[in-house]
Regions:
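Gram-negative/organellar outer-membrane beta-barrel architecture
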Residues: 1-100, 109
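C-terminal outer-membrane beta-barrel translocator/porin domains of Gram-negative envelope proteins
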Residues: 69-177
Length: 177
């Protein structure tokens, strides 16, 4: 299977999915989602280490809140409803200088992403992300210093007043300082 759409290294991909997730089972929050969607992705190489990507994805999500859901879940469902369809457009710029794709020991990977729902979607929001991974050898015992960081911002536009709680950014977790 050749992932490239043209001889110049332009890539094209497709995705189709269906997800049922009960977040109460994971003790995360008291709600469940059913969602399905499809998308198409294109990637274009700028040079040996840089690439841009353009993605378009359709998504339909149904959210069911359990008893006594968190305030952010209730606020979103009261404001925007519990079933909605979105068409998301995403642009990505990547710069990768890793010495290898799996288990790198030197180099960095930087991604800048801008995602927005297309006007006419049931909810209108946008996200900006910056992801960075840096690996440097420590010079003894084959040890490698690794740093992974992510910054993000989410906002709404149009008639949407509350950001989708399932798209929010969170700090902390088992792999955080």
């Amino acid at each position: 299977f050749d992932p490239y759409f043209t001889m110049d290294g332009v890539s094209r991909g497709y995705s189709v999915y269906f997800r049922e997730t009960d977040y109460g089972e994971f003790n995360v929050a008291n709600y469940l989602t059913n969602s399905f969607g499809a998308g198409i992705q294109f990637g274009y190489p700028i040079n040996e280490i840089q690439r841009i990507g353009l993605n378009l994805n359709y998504d339909k999500t149904d959210i069911s809140a359990g008893t006594l859901p968190a305030r952010e879940i209730s606020n979103f469902l009261n404001s925007e409803g519990d079933i909605f369809e979105t068409l998301k457009a995403q642009a990505v710029w990547s710069r990768i200088t890793l010495n290898r794709g799996l288990f790198p020991t030197n180099g960095s990977s930087i991604d800048v992403l801008f995602q927005t729902t297309v006007p006419g979607s049931d909810i209108d929001y946008y996200k900006i992300n910056l992801r960075n991974k840096i690996y440097r050898p420590l010079g003894f015992a084959d040890l490698v210093f690794g740093f992974v960081g992510e910054l993000g911002y989410i906002g709404t536009y149009g008639d949407t007043e509350v950001t989708p709680f399932f798209e929010n950014f969170y700090s902390g977790g088992p792999r955080s300082l």
